[in-house]
From Swiss-Prot:
The record marks R275 as: Important for acyl-CoA specificity. InterPro entries: AB_hydrolase_1 (IPR000073), AB_hydrolase_fold (IPR029058), HAT_MetX-like (IPR008220). This is Serine O-succinyltransferase. It is an enzyme of class 2 (transferase). It catalyses: succinyl-CoA + L-serine = O-succinyl-L-serine + CoA. The gene is CysA.
């Protein structure tokens, strides 16, 4: 990837302000990125007399702005195009050395898909004891790899580096910690960028729709392989917080303690909307090519923009007020439509850094799995029925069990911008507002009534707002759980929003360590 870094360093300089004198504008030639033409004109502006004639196409009132941010994207596309023709598909997704579990046993997925075989990438820290009862399964967020902490084989710092190790949150003197790259990912586990063994071509968007529960079932295949009958604890943050709860619901007899940080028991409209927007931006990139881009230019522009949207949801407004305020990157220059304010340059950097580090299709599939997440009993029963029907088709010899057809369903009437008179207070209020969790969710979390559960939320989190963690705790209490612990970090403790679980070793790490001990 080093040539791309060179491109980033040689980006065109932002549009510079032109010195002006009263009643006269002298404009130099300005390159227009869209058509590469130059305009060279000088024209007098009179304060009195007859009205000036309308500018002709060759004599514009002002020069066109330059767009170095678009130039950079075009340059990157050109470089990737040349590279893909000369050295095969780009990029290669990897997080470094990891172990790999391969299962030859087919995996039936919740929505009817079938993986004839699959791999799960994983890494471990600490020592597995003789009874194999000191295992902590660490679940990741959406785009993380199995590399949660550095290892001898891969010394690069992991995404939870400060939380894992001797005497730390996940104490490797006591516990054997396992972290996997989720099913559907691109860091060693089977996903859209994996070759389909049926035809030798990459799955791309032929990969079946996934659920969080599918990911957990694949993880437990790994545990079976390692001879781990029961986990000491299931720990996760963000999407990992979903997985941690799902592990307990799916395998209540195989999970001890449960930790869910900045997660939820079911996805809610705001979070779904933000992930949908990211997917739409990505899919509108022409290079996405309906998912079949592996032998050509990856949709780096769509990925960049999707990551920028995601970054807005990962942090908090109050933090950015303190960190960036209204500062511009260079106040001496004329405002530009490309990144100009410090916050814009921050988002631009976040998107640029990510756009070739992660597979676009993995982002689509895994984010959709998050949207589909619902531990309510109704959804669990519907899924059980779907799986039974799919299994019956497989047993009868039907080859295709996955219905890949879909339709764009739009409302017959325009949406109302205000709640209708028929909307009940129960429909409008969350569990945290009413003090009563939905009966369906209470029934769905009943398998966890005898588990020790720690739920942590962050007041400044806008992606998984703190009321969603309160909903988990209140639901568990109503389901009969008498030991659930709920901690909410206020704005006086953390302004880092959803990313707090990655940064706050003292409050997040301290609470988890105390709970595990």
């Amino acid at each position: 990837m080093s040539p791309l870094n060179g491109v980033a360093r040689s980006l065109p300089r932002p549009f510079q302000a032109v010195a002006r004198r009263p009643f006269r504008v002298a404009q130099p030639a300005v390159a227009c990125p869209s058509n590469r033409r130059s305009f060279n004109h000088s024209r007098s502006l009179r304060s009195t007399g007859s009205q000036s004639p309308a500018p002709s196409p060759r004599d514009s009132s002002n020069p066109a702005l330059s767009f170095p941010c678009l130039d950079a994207q075009e340059a990157k596309s050109a470089l990737l195009s040349a590279r893909s023709l000369g050295s095969g598909p780009e990029p290669s997704y990897t997080a470094g050395h990891h172990e790999r579990f391969h299962s030859d046993e087919p995996l039936l997925l919740d929505w009817g898909g079938l993986l004839p075989e699959f791999d799960i990438a994983y890494e471990t820290w600490g020592q597995l004891n003789e009874k194999k009862d000191n295992v902590i399964l660490l679940h990741t967020g959406l785009s993380a790899s199995s590399h949660a902490h550095s290892t001898e084989a891969n010394p690069k710092p992991g995404w939870w580096e400060k939380f894992i190790g001797p005497g730390k949150t996940l104490d490797t003197d006591k516990y054997f910690v396992i972290c996997t790259n989720v099913l559907g990912g691109c860091y060693g586990s089977t996903g859209p960028s994996t070759v389909d063994p049926s035809d030798g071509k990459k799955y791309a968007t032929r990969f079946p729709i996934l659920t969080i529960e599918d990911m957990v079932r694949a993880q437990f295949r790994l545990l079976d392989h390692l001879g781990v009958r029961k986990l000491y604890a299931s720990v996760g943050s963000s999407m990992g917080g979903m997985q941690s709860l799902a592990a307990g619901v799916l395998f209540p007899e195989r999970v001890g303690k449960i930790v869910s940080i900045s997660g939820c028991a079911r996805s809610h409209p705001y979070s779904i909307a933000m992930r949908h927007t990211q997917r739409q931006v990505l899919m509108m990139d022409p290079n996405w090519a309906r998912g079949f881009y592996y032998d050509s230019i990856p949709p780096h522009s769509g990925m960049k923009l999707a990551r920028e949207i995601a970054t807005v949801t990962y942090r908090s407004g109050p933090e950015w007020e303190k960190r960036f305020g209204r500062k511009r990157a260079d106040p001496s220059k004329q405002p530009a439509l490309c990144p100009d304010f410090l916050i814009e340059t921050y988002l631009d950097h976040a998107g640029e850094k990510f756009c070739l580090e992660y597979d676009a299709n993995s982002l689509l599939y895994i984010s959709k799995a998050m949207d589909l997440f619902d531990l309510g009993l109704t959804q669990q029963l519907a899924t059980k029925k779907q799986r039974a029907e799919a299994q019956a088709k497989i047993s009868s010899g039907t080859n295709t069990v996955n219905d890949a057809s879909c339709s764009l369903t739009l409302p017959e009437q325009p949406y109302q911008e205000q709640p209708s008179a028929s909307t009940s207070a129960e429909q409008s209020a969350s569990a945290s507002e009413t003090g009563s969790a939905p009966n369906d969710l209470v029934a769905g979390l009943a398998p966890l009534k005898d588990h020790q559960v720690l739920v942590i939320g962050v007041a400044s989190d806008i992606l998984f707002p703190a009321w969603q963690q309160r909903e988990i705790a209140e639901t568990l209490i109503q389901a009969g759980n008498k030991t659930v612990e709920h901690i909410e970090l206020g704005n006086d403790v953390s302004l880092f929003g959803h990313d707090t679980f990655l940064l706050d070793v003292k409050n997040v790490g301290g609470a988890v360590r105390k709970f595990l001990d």
